[in-house]
Regions:
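Alpha-helical transmembrane segments of multipass membrane proteins
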Residues: 38-42, 119-120, 153-157, 180-187, ...
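Short alpha-helical transmembrane segments in multi-pass integral membrane proteins
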Residues: 1-26, 80-146, 177-184, 192-250, ...
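Interfacial/gating helices of multi-pass transporter permease domains
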Residues: 21, 44-63, 129-133, 197-198, ...
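Short runs within selected transmembrane alpha-helices of multi-pass transporters and secretion channels
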Residues: 73, 77, 141-159, 167-175, ...
Length: 460
């Protein structure tokens, strides 16, 4: 067996600095990603609660369809970060190329699936006042799959090589474009026709097209500055590498699909409880999702740093990188939980002043405050495991805690016990809490094993 690199143990501050250097831009990128959906919701707010519910439901359904393609491309985190840690830049470029080819192959079936999902809305018992406007919004949004998947492939490639600022700039500028396009297309300014909710969907398409174009140019310019050898690499389709990428990505896609699928069904259940319940559910969920973007971004930083450490043969360093990512995420989650408890109505008033919706949303934010720490733990631990090449453990965890515990308990409390949308959220939070505990345990076992292996091997 090859000797394991055992460097001097860095101080906690020494671990924190590189984690934050990577995590902060990635977190801001994740927030920028979420802001695009928030902007859509805010911009249609004057159209009424039905419009808020329709855009919220449409975004959840879109991301349910999007999850498979997005998740498969997460395999690039493992391949590129480990190759970069080992100093094999050509391997990074070749993996990126396979990701781009795969993104092209995934876009068309994803678009078709989006249209099929919209045809199911009446059969799912969705209020016609919500189902009607949801359909044109999703139809427009479906055209963003191709630029979206291309952006994801380029983003994972650049981030795994510690290139994060270009990704952040792409998101910030795309949000500005999306905001302006919403103003023009929803309400018919500058002489263009008033498209209503559909205009919000088309605005997002425009923003995502800008993102992939910006990132493609950024990748080329970065390679020229660093003489990274992108144009000298063999970028032809590589079926062996493609199979490896898919093998890593499919469980990651299933992990995401299982969680997003639960919240998609939760939105459907909330819609059956009435317009006010759905609006409160969507606003509270969107606020919780905004704060979730921080640990989600930290999880990417954890995956990259763990993968890079493994690539250079530093298993103890991989363990320390993963634990530092979890610590950073928990610190933030503590603050967001406190904010939800202390300022619920102030946060919800961004969306609406409807008293019934505010009351429901405030109660749901109190529940969200409880599961913040566990939700942060589960997503960051899953990222750490992904950096190590383990995408199956998080997938199996999500299957059990969400589909065999969280959703059944939520449905029972909401409909059988008559607790409504509050009962639904209590069930979902149970699954999130269990998921955090299970994945924390899985990561702890792996980190202990690495320490033991390092202690039994000669240092180099």
């Amino acid at each position: 067996m090859a000797a394991i690199v055992v460097p001097d143990r860095p101080t906690p501050l020494g671990e924190l600095r590189p984690t934050l250097a990577l995590a902060v831009p990635v977190v801001l990128t994740e927030l920028g990603w979420m802001v695009m959906g928030v902007v859509d919701t805010i911009m249609v707010g004057p159209l009424g609660p039905e419009a808020i519910g329709a855009v919220g439901l449409g975004n959840i359904l879109f991301f349910m369809v999007n999850t498979f393609g997005y998740g498969v491309l997460l395999g690039l985190d493992t391949l590129v970060s480990q190759a970069f840690g080992a100093g094999k830049l050509e391997e990074c470029h070749r993996s990126m190329a396979q990701g781009v080819y795969l993104s092209l192959a995934l876009a068309i079936p994803s678009m078709a699936a989006c249209w099929v999902v919209t045809s199911w809305l009446p059969a799912l018992g969705i209020d016609p006042a919500i189902a009607g406007p949801t359909r044109p919004y999703m139809h427009a949004l479906s055209y963003s799959f191709l630029p979206l998947f291309g952006f994801v492939a380029l983003r994972r490639y650049l981030q795994a090589m510690n290139v994060v600022r270009s990704v952040l700039v792409a998101l910030v500028t795309a949000n500005l474009i999306n905001w302006g396009a919403n103003w023009v297309l929803i309400y018919g300014h500058l002489g263009l026709p008033r498209l209503g909710i559909a205009g919000s969907g088309w605005s997002t398409v425009i923003g995502r097209t800008w993102m992939v174009g910006f990132l493609a140019v950024a990748a080329i310019l970065h390679d020229r500055r660093t003489d990274g050898g992108l144009w000298r690499a063999d970028l032809r389709p590589d079926w062996r590498r493609m199979r490896t990428l898919i093998g890593l990505g499919l469980p990651a896609a299933a992990y995401l699909a299982l969680e997003i699928g639960v919240f998609t069904l939760a939105a459907v259940f909330a819609a059956r409880l009435g317009v006010a319940a759905l609006a409160g559910h969507e606003m509270a969920l969107q606020l919780a999702s905004v704060t979730f973007m921080v640990p989600l971004g930290v999880s990417t930083a954890g995956a990259v740093r763990v993968g890079q450490a493994i690539g250079r043969g530093d298993l103890p360093g991989a363990g320390r990188a993963g634990w530092m990512a979890i610590a950073v995420g928990l610190a933030f989650a503590s603050g967001s939980a406190l904010m939800f408890v202390c300022l619920p109505r102030s946060l919800l008033s961004i969306y609406t002043t409807d008293p019934a919706v505010l009351s429901i949303g405030a109660t749901l934010l109190a529940i969200a405050a409880v599961f913040q720490l566990f939700d942060a733990t589960q997503v960051i631990a899953a990222g750490d495991l992904r950096g190590a090449g383990d995408t199956r453990t998080p997938m199996l965890c999500n299957l059990v805690v969400h589909w065999f515990v969280g959703l059944p308990v939520g449905y029972l409390m909401a409909f059988t016990l008559g607790k409504g949308v509050v009962g639904l959220w209590l069930g979902l939070s149970t699954g999130l809490i269990l998921g955090g505990l299970v994945l924390m345990g899985a990561w702890a076992r792996r980190a202990r094993r690495w320490r033991a292996e390092a202690g039994s091997q000669p240092a180099t």
